[in-house]
Amino acid sequence: MVRKKANHSRPGMNAAKAQGKDAGLTSQFHAEIGQEPLNQAQRQNNKKRKKNQ
């Protein structure tokens, strides 16, 4: 059975220009978050998530 396409979706809705300034992965916020080291609890959770993928 094929799923029906949603009526409310608009073409280009997920485009970067529709999500505001610095919304993508190259934003300054994303670059700052990536530099912080993980604490022990976050590291353990990360291992579990990678294992489940």
From Swiss-Prot:
Region of interest (Disordered), ranges: 1-53
Presence of keyword Manganese: no
Organism superkingdom: Bacteria
Example GO BP: sporulation resulting in formation of a cellular spore
Keywords: Sporulation
Predominant subcellular localization, coarse grouping: other
Subcellular location: Spore core
InterPro entries with a match to the protein in the record: SASP_SspO (IPR012613)
Record-stated family: Belongs to the SspO family.
Name of the featured protein: Small, acid-soluble spore protein O
Protein species of origin: Halalkalibacterium halodurans (strain ATCC BAA-125 / DSM 18197 / FERM 7344 / JCM 9153 / C-125) (Bacillus halodurans)
